[in-house]
């Protein structure tokens, strides 16, 4: 199938693009500049240089495709992009896979797709855009909701890996808040697999949470990182005000959410089988270990 893809050179997109190609799909990536276009071509896909807020361009590319996967989601992009895609795909029944985010659900010890929304300020803009995709007539619109994505030494896990370590005779790694909050997590390659499954088999109007099933606390992750960094597992809590000052109020509010999720629906409905290493394993002996050892 011919797929229009945004965000192809981003963190998640860099795993989605090769997986789509491996599955035999033809991919056209909408990218912002020629340097990104060359990366896409080198990977074996076609590229169009343009702006995701160019409604006429997006509608034409969507019309020419067999469906769309939108990874480059943003508050300043989504309203125009979604409207253009729905225009281009109108009445076709073709798939449109949009990107959500786990923070939309707020603090919750057992997040499922139908859990109530309680987003932090940072992601409050998502709801209306997701509703537009899920409620579209004549389009097989679905939303993949990544939890905190990690892997390949990148992603939000770097806020733990690169956290301040203090000084003195017994330096300690700085936590985010007191570290008691759980994070729902998923490996980037597992997220990529779910996007492909949602495109191929996802049902119209459905949401699929991408959660690998491990929900460690930030303190647990911090202690592992502190051991890998040669700090004997020493960590230091900080106040909410300190976290906000260090990371910015918006990101701090989101990272302080206490969230747990399992991703059960995607497993049952789409046959998704996340099998990437856990974030804990990645910190101890995987893709984040070299940075911890040398920081």
Question: Which residue ranges define each predicted feature?
Answer:
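Conserved beta-loop-beta element that borders a ligand/cofactor-binding pocket
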Residues: 130-153
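Conserved C-terminal active-site "lid" loop/helix of NAD(P)H-dependent oxidoreductases
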Residues: 219, 244-273
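Glycine/proline-rich active-site loop of Rossmann-fold NAD(P)-dependent oxidoreductases
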Residues: 149-162, 169, 198-208, 214
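Amphipathic terminal alpha-helices
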Residues: 277-295
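A conserved pocket-lining segment of Rossmann-fold NAD(P)-dependent short-chain dehydrogenase/reductase
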Residues: 162-186, 190
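Mid/C-terminal beta-alpha module of Rossmann-like enzyme folds, strongest
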Residues: 194-251, 291-295
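N-terminal Rossmann NAD(P)H-binding glycine-rich loop of SDR-like oxidoreductase domains
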Residues: 3-25
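NAD(P)-cofactor binding segment of oxidoreductase domains
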Residues: 57-98, 102
């Amino acid at each position: 199938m011919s797929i229009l893809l945004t965000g192809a050179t981003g963190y998640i997109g860099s795993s989605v693009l090769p997986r789509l190609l491996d599955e035999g799909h033809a991919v056209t990536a909408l990218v912002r500049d020629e340097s990104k276009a060359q990366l896409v071509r080198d990977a074996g896909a076609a590229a169009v240089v343009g702006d995701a807020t160019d409604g006429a361009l997006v509608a034409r590319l969507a019309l020419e495709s067999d469906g769309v996967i939108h990874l480059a989601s943003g508050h300043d992009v989504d309203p125009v992009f979604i409207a253009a895609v729905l225009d281009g795909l109108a009445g076709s029944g073709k798939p449109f896979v949009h990107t959500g985010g786990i923070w939309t659900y707020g603090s919750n010890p057992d997040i499922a797709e139908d859990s109530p929304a309680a987003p932090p300020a940072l992601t409050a803009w998502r709801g209306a855009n997701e509703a537009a995709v899920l409620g579209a007539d004549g389009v097989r619109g679905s939303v993949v909701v990544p939890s905190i994505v990690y892997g390949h030494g990148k992603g939000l896990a770097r806020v733990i890996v690169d956290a301040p370590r203090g000084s003195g005779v017994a330096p300690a790694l700085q936590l985010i808040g007191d570290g008691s909050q759980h994070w729902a997590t998923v490996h980037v390659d597992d997220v990529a697999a779910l996007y492909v499954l949602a495109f191929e088999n996802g049902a119209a109007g459905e949401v699929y949470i991408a959660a690998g099933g491990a929900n460690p606390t930030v303190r647990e992750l911090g202690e592992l990182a502190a051991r890998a960094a040669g700090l004997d597992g020493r960590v230091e809590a900080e106040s909410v005000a300190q976290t906000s000052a260090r990371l910015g109020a918006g990101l701090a509010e989101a990272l302080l959410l206490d969230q747990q999720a399992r991703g059960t629906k995607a497993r049952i409905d789409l046959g998704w089988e996340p099998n990437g290493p856990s974030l804990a394993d990645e910190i101890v002996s995987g893709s984040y270990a070299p940075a911890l050892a040398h920081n």
